[in-house]
Every structure is written in C-alpha cells, then in structure tokens.
C-alpha cells in the first residue's frame, strides 16, 4: 500500500526537479538582439568603471542567462581582455589582444536589468576577478 503513495510522490519530485524553476534563470541565446544589447551595455558600463586608459572587450562568453523579473534580468559570465584602443578615442571595432600578457584576461559576472517599456536599463552587478 505504501508503494502506491511513495512511487507517485517520487515521480512528481523527479519531474519538478528536472523541469527547472518557473521564473528562474534560463540559458540566453547570444543571437537574440536583447541579449546582445544587454551585454554591450554591460561592457560599456564596465569600461566606465575601470581605471585603465584602454578599452576592455569580451574575449569569451562563458555563460549567458536571462530571467523574467518585472522586466528581463540578464546574467553574464564573461572572460574580459584589454584591447589596443584607448578610451575616448575614435570609436572603431577593437579586438582583444592575442598576446595574453597584453590582454591581461580576467573573469567578470555582469547582471543587467532591462525594462524596455520604461526605456530603462541598469547594471545591477559588475563583479570581476583576476
């Protein structure tokens, strides 16, 4: 008799555990315009905060997620690196140095909260480590 109760409960628990949390973070597609715009915003804000004369760019996207929260929260884990372009210079496409000693790579976690209907986008987390 107990197995008639235990088996369905285990099946429900297994299904819920594998389905993911409703409203929780999910993988973001880097081909999506909203995701790309949020990452670009994060990079611009990050560069404003760095005490370096050179622009930093994303060398590699390690992880990208999004979460519906009264708007959209984007969570990025990225590998950043220095470019040869100086801050405040003429805007052009700048790639990260190929030489790791020049690129000085480091890992960052950025969180961006976007509410497009309010024309509002904010950086809520900008955390980096060497």
Curated annotation (Swiss-Prot):
Segments carrying motif Secondary area of contact: 67-71
Keywords: Disulfide bond, Protease inhibitor, Secreted, Signal, Thiol protease inhibitor
Region forming the signal peptide: 1-19
Disulphide bonds in the chain: 85-94, 108-128
Source superkingdom: Eukaryota
SUPFAM superfamilies associated with the record: Cystatin/monellin
Gene Ontology MF terms in the entry: cysteine-type endopeptidase inhibitor activity; peptidase inhibitor activity
CDD domains for this protein: CY
UniProt keyword DNA damage present: no
Tissue specificity: Ubiquitous expression including brain, white muscle, heart, gill, kidney, spleen, liver and skin with the highest and lowest level in brain and gill, respectively.
InterPro entries documented for this protein: Cystatin_dom, Cystatin_sf, Prot_inh_cystat_CS
Function: Cysteine proteinase inhibitor.
Protein family: Belongs to the cystatin family.
Protein name as catalogued: Cystatin
Species in which this protein is naturally found: Oncorhynchus keta
Lineage, broadest ranks: Eukaryota, Metazoa, Chordata, Craniata, Vertebrata
